[in-house]
Amino acid sequence: MTATEATASPAVQQAAAKAGRERFASRLGFILISAGCAIGLGNVWRFPYITGQYGGAAFVLLYLLFLVILGLPVMVMEFAVGRASQKSSALAFDTLQPSRRWHWFSWWGFIGCLILMMFYTTVGGWMLSYVVKMGTGAFNGLDAAGSAEVFGAMLANPGELIGWMLAVCVIGFLVCSMGLQKGVERITKVMMTCLLLVMVVLVVRSLTLPGAQAGIEFYLIPDFGKLFAGETVSEQWATFGNAVYAAMGQAFFTLSLGISAMEVFGSYIGKDRSLTGEAVRICGLDTGVALLAGLIIFPACFAFGVNPGEGPSLVFVTLPIVFNQMPLGQLWGALFFLFMSFAALSTIIAVFENLISFVMDKWGLDRKTAVVRMAVTVVVLSLPCALGYNVLSGVSIPAIGDIQSIEDFIVSNNMLPLGSLLYLVFCISRKGWGWEKFLAEADAGQGLKFPAWSLPWLKWGIPALIIVIFVMGYAPKVALWLGLA
């Protein structure tokens, strides 16, 4: 079997050309947009915290291991499916394997992206809101209680949350309406460049604060003892198990794999570069942003004696107080939330493009019509989350939480791991696309090749890890539901 036969057939390629499939204008655009999709809020409010908790650089090494053996292969598979088919997930599986009933899987990614946007647009709106709040001095003179009150007041105001959610949707869909090259690629390249520049400025400011050294040591100096913290041997191994699970989860979830978020970008590129090399660059950029976020947060928190927590409370309650204590704190705080806004919007624009491409391929719509229909759909579906902190605050599920937590649980604990498993089966199984065809597509072009010797690991190792992630995500919740915890 030749490389040409093993990838997309000439008929598929000719059909794509006749259909006028849009293309990225540059390789840099593809890398930055794919990285922008991966770089999200978890890079800021989760990765730095668990890195410090489990031994700094010791945990980073563990994380990088799982990024390479778990996240990277699945990312290459998503890119390969997109590039070989020259279609979004709406038609990719039928194009590559028309004799099997893989077409139902196309809806998995579409629904997953929709649910992701149901809460991500609201949280992205928080970032825009805080750029304004920090810039106008809303936190001046406030202590931790006052900062928490500002955050609570925002959540309790449905009009404010809906307004900022609408602003995020308008920005995202407006960019997508301008087209792939003139809109999505051009704007995202500018936004990602600004994100990196703002991060560098904030890192320099944070590292030069008096007392920042303690935060740097906590974050980066390897402490393998923290990987085995505990009084007894069983406690020590339990800590190590938690660290391994945290590393696996972070490596897996940070890339948003399994809902075809990356697949569509593969359909916009040619075959001049191998996909493994491109995926390595994207993962490296995503990891770099996460590491830089820690260099902003920990030195600043330690410099002012503030305990760095995890999650939204770190970003929306703790950090405004830290910025308050800095000279020119309003400026640094506004820049930080501008960086956070760019991180959120880069993901939102990328996923919006995925949704738009899906309906364009599925129903033959032009871009403008697809944008309007998806904009209305996303806004309507985002309302429950925006109202979930106030009008619908009584809606919750035990062990999961409010509406936003429920939506996040559906995507993160279910659709991402199971979707990744399905991509894996499709790419290596004879009943799917097949290993030889996938490998030929992944290796087409110059650059790093996908290791052919890794097939046994793909067959047995990755499925086992994905099942562990899936089960571990449910274990504490099931224990609570059964009254065992």
What are these regions (language model features)?
Residues 2-24, 185, 189-345, 349, ...:
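Membrane-embedded translocation segments of transport machinery
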Residues 1-45, 74-79, 83-96, 100-107, ...:
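Membrane-interface "cap" regions at the ends of multi-pass membrane proteins
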Residues 18-21, 50-54, 89-108, 121-181, ...:
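Inter-helical loop and helix-membrane interface segments of multi-pass membrane transporters/permeases
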Residues 344-350, 371-389, 405-440:
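Hydrophobic alpha-helical segments of multi-pass membrane transport proteins
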Residues 401-425, 447-485:
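A generic transmembrane alpha-helix motif of multi-pass inner-membrane proteins
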Residues 23-34, 59-62, 101-114, 162-168, ...:
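Select transmembrane alpha-helical segments in multipass membrane proteins
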Residues 28-66, 260-263, 277-280, 284, ...:
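Transmembrane helix-boundary motif of multi-pass solute transporters/channels
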Residues 50-54, 80, 101-117, 152, ...:
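Membrane-water interface regions at transmembrane-helix termini and the short interhelical loops
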